[in-house]
Swiss-Prot record:
This is ATP-dependent protease subunit HslV. A double ring-shaped homohexamer of HslV is capped on each side by a ring-shaped HslU homohexamer. The assembly of the HslU/HslV complex is dependent on binding of ATP. Na(+) binds at residues 166, 169, 172. Belongs to the peptidase T1B family. HslV subfamily. The gene is hslV. The active site is at 12.
Length: 184
């Protein structure tokens, strides 16, 4: 790597599962720069707004917190309308000169809907209530899809799937943060 090139930040796996009257978002705690783990217990999943929305992020931490703050502002403008708030955030994210340079992805959920938001303006609802982002996202997604029809509850599926991702992805660890909402 040339000295003029910044190190690439790697890390995280965020997964959401909606099943059995619950929606769960979980994520690992590892943050790496280059080949070095610089933090193992980062909290990348949290409650938003008045606690009726949960979210997780993959990407640059400062960028993600900026986007969480913007989403909370949109949720205040459009209370109880996560999809509308997410679409409005995505519009801003894509068109605002400052925001469009932010490098992060977000998974957010309320009692009715789960969404992934990207800097390219995408607001996507997962198939079968399962979606993942981040470096270990494909591994966690595959594991969760394999487990979704089992008798396991949503939180168990999230925990097991993130453990499987941690077995495979060097940028994912087992220091998990899990948030749950009732969908009833």
């Amino acid at each position: 790597m040339q000295a003029s090139q910044p190190e690439v930040w790697h890390g995280t796996t965020i997964l959401t599962v909606r099943k059995g009257g619950k929606v769960v978002i979980g994520g690992d705690g590892q943050v790496s720069i280059g080949q070095t783990v610089i933090k193992s217990n980062a909290k990348k999943v949290r409650k938003l707004g008045k606690g009726d929305v949960i979210g997780g992020f993959a990407g640059a931490t400062a960028d993600a917190f900026t986007l969480f703050e913007r989403l909370e502002s949109k949720l205040e403008q459009y209370p109880g309308q996560l999809t509308r708030a997410a679409v409005e955030l995505a519009k801003d994210w894509r068109t605002d000169r400052y925001l469009r340079r932010l490098e992060a992805m977000m998974l957010v959920a309320d009692k009715d809907v789960s969404l992934v938001l990207t800097g390219t303006g995408d607001v996507l609802e997962p198939e079968a209530g399962v979606m993942a982002i981040g470096s270990g996202g494909n591994y966690a997604l595959s594991a969760a899809r394999a487990l979704i029809d089992s008798d396991k509850d949503a939180e168990t599926i999230v925990r097991r799937s993130l453990d499987i991702a941690a077995d495979i992805c060097v940028y994912t660890n087992r220091n998990l943060t899990i948030e749950t909402l009732s969908t009833d």
